């Protein structure tokens, strides 16, 4: 049995990091090595993100609410004016939003065939996604 947070760590977090990395480089002029430092990942990981080789398990670019959260996170990281706690909370907010919108369901089903997407309300129930 896999739980939604496990799927999020394996599939969603790399997508979010890829989106943030691209925004840091495109909008804030960071080089790959600088974006890697800010995101606490390796420069080769950033290279894979920028070439769409890693971080493509779920398509989030067309969701304006998620894109706004990503942009806010990228801005905070680029400016370096926010606490680690707030960065973590923003990551969690992005994940909760993705889960609440039902965007994780098909991935969860791929990890655990016993998940009944049509009946499951775990992620869309606002009380169940209070991880932080």
Residue ranges and their predicted role:
Residues 57-74:
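Short Lys/Arg-enriched helix C-cap and helix-to-coil transition segments
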Residues 31-37:
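Short alpha-helical "recognition helix" segments of helix-turn-helix
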Residues 72-132:
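Helix-turn-helix/homeodomain-like alpha-helical modules used for DNA recognition
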Residues 1-17:
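Short, Lys/Arg-enriched anionic-surface-contact patches
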Residues 53-54:
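C-terminal flanking helix
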Residues 13-29:
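Short, amphipathic alpha-helical "recognition" segments used to contact nucleic acids or chromatin
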Residues 40-44:
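Short coil turns linking two alpha-helices in DNA-binding domains
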